[in-house]
A protein has these predicted regions:
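Amphipathic alpha-helical linker/stalk segments
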Residues: 3, 29, 65-93, 111, ...
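Helix-turn-helix
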Residues: 14, 18, 26-60, 64
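An amphipathic alpha-helix signature
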Residues: 20, 93, 97, 132-143, ...
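Short helix-capping/turn signature of helix-turn-helix
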Residues: 55, 115-120
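Hydrophobic alpha-helical connector segments
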Residues: 60, 64, 78-105, 151, ...
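Hydrophobic alpha-helical bundle segments that form small-molecule/ligand-binding pockets
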Residues: 83-85, 105, 120-121, 131-163, ...
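Helical hydrophobic small-molecule/effector-binding pocket
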Residues: 89-114, 129, 133-140, 164-165
Length: 207
């Protein structure tokens, strides 16, 4: 009996992974608004009914499919928060590498989750929490910079929020479907923008 239960559990996990894999592949070329349960299940060769044994709806599917990516984003946030970005371009560049790597690996899925957030309150709340954490970390990082302290912007909190939203929009545009440019170019571009704000007049190239 125990063996039978284990086989059933393994079979359910296999089916769930098959559905997640199909959806992950489809969002490379399909927006969330265009994605349908029928299309996902057609990719798996399984019936529509089976989908609802595992997921409530497409938003639920994306949340589960994106769990790894979201966990990696939180880890990237931690790395950004610990980076000594007041030290200059190399430190800023290193701070961005983890987040750029996450978007490089999971860009289409993160784009689909962002699109789904426009229509799903739970997903929207989750995205807002991630954005706020990044904005808070950005503000704390900027506040500790001597050049910012000497010549502060009119509203440091809003500057941090604007930089964070720019980061997110740029990364989603660059990696939301097939990668448009190399990750190294993205890292350097973000480094140059942040250097212009945090260390005006200083070079953003590697030291």
């Amino acid at each position: 009996m125990t063996t039978r239960r284990a086989e059933i559990r393994a079979s359910r996990l296999q089916v769930r992974e098959q559905i997640v894999s199909a959806a992950t592949e489809l969002v490379r070329t399909t927006s969330f608004a265009e994605l349908t349960v029928d299309e996902v299940m057609r990719e798996t060769g399984l019936s529509r009914t089976i989908f609802y044994r595992h997921f409530d709806d497409l938003a639920d599917l994306l949340l589960r499919a994106g769990r790894e990516a979201i966990e990696e984003l939180f880890e990237a946030q931690r790395a950004f928060g610990e980076a000594p970005i007041a030290d200059g371009p190399d430190a800023i560049r290193s701070a961005f590498v983890p987040a750029v790597a996450v978007y490089s690996r999971h860009g289409p899925l993160l784009r689909a989750i962002a699109e789904a957030g426009a229509a799903d309150e739970e997903m929207s709340a989750g995205q807002q929490a991630v954005r706020q954490r990044f904005a808070d970390l950005a503000e704390a990082a900027l506040r500790g910079m001597p050049d910012i302290a000497a010549n502060p912007p009119a509203d440091l909190s809003e500057t941090a929020r604007a930089l964070n939203l720019m980061n997110e929009a740029y990364l989603l545009e660059a990696f939301g479907r097939d990668a448009r440019v190399p990750a190294e170019t993205i890292v350097q571009t973000l480094t140059e923008i942040w250097m212009a704000v945090a260390h005006p007049g200083k070079e953003a190239h590697a030291e």
